């Protein structure tokens, strides 16, 4: 059967039974849709009757909110799908507006409409499919060539799961009030509320948080998006999507799921954000991790003469397929870890480089573990050009940079044997931009020339892939000599610790060295592949092997034969 880029799944089974049926339904849908899957909840709708069914309100209860959580949890097993539960017809007890009084536009118009509704004979019965298509197009903007499919998932026994009438989903949404509530208790609606987060690489746990907030809000939802100082403590912050990109993805998702709301997306620059200062807000949705932060917001509000917000706590979604060193919850940190070793942007064509030689530039801040990665690549078959080694050749007496450097910085930078004391020279230039530029204007062109000569040596030895290991690769402009830039990143605090331990410098001297270099963020912005040595050695090895294997797949055969 054809695979569609976008689809609409209309769920008609009563909630009490639907929860147990979700896994096979999602599996069936994932075989037909390969990108965006919208979900419309209409329990009890009959597509087999004489009358054309119409959209009707679904009472927002805690059971419905729990179901939303369970659906997104199940969707996490199908990572190729961008699942979006549509909320226009899910309404709180305080507001019953006309449901879908006009056709709702969707960012990705469905090409196919699917349903769990089944005919008695298990066929693709045309009148039912026609009713389904009419229902879908009366509610949402769909593709003109809309197809329809009645799903018949394998439920094991072939029968609906039998559950006692009081069998309810476990609670995943908790109001801050200690008062016990029934899962079928209606949810209160509020005029304005707030939710906050980093929202990097929007995932299903984010979608639960945002969806609950959208159900509770009747007029406006304020969304705080973490930026600047609040990002510094994040794992692999260099791989965070830019603020504008995160806001763009958030906006599309929010407008898709509940266009009747007004959304205000603002930078979150401190732990309180708008929730701490806006007197018109009534509720705040938090996760288990941020619940204490929500309590702190309420204390801050009380201290400043504002009413407390109603807090709604969402349980964390368990990541059922997390890897080693990843969190056991669905998180953006794990998504960023999975990017390590992947190609982030296309390689560069370098026709001026030696024919038949593919060149990687390996860089990273001091202490990043770049040289250990170079050794791992060497073990896999790469020819390594060590820029530090070339620098030693350039600085050596009689070397191409020796005399110009001595003339520029004086003979007091020399050892008694006439060799350049690089520690003394380094103390002159680190932290002094003018002196550093004088040195680099001399040395960088010399090392670049030596590197090109080494490329010719690699070709003569029959090598087809070489790596230029250079901390200053991008500062020196040597990216023009490579097809791909690979960057090794670690937190600056870890880099300082390693430099102090390795080189015997003070923390201040180590920080000064790092400040004279491009930041990890600046390096990543110009990189094709990113790696990290933050974890155990075997984790680094797995990353490097992953990156190497992906490289082999995208290399032309001419570059693969002699390594």
Curated annotation (Swiss-Prot):
It comes from the Eukaryota. Disulfide bonds: none annotated. Keywords: ATP-binding, Coenzyme A biosynthesis, Cytoplasm, Kinase, Mitochondrion, Multifunctional enzyme, Nucleotide-binding, Nucleotidyltransferase, Phosphoprotein, Transferase. SUPFAM superfamilies: Nucleotidylyl transferase (SSF52374), P-loop containing nucleoside triphosphate hydrolases (SSF52540). Its EC number is 2.7.7.3, 2.7.1.24. The modification Phosphoserine is found at residues 177, 182. In the central section; belongs to the eukaryotic CoaD family. This is Bifunctional coenzyme A synthase.
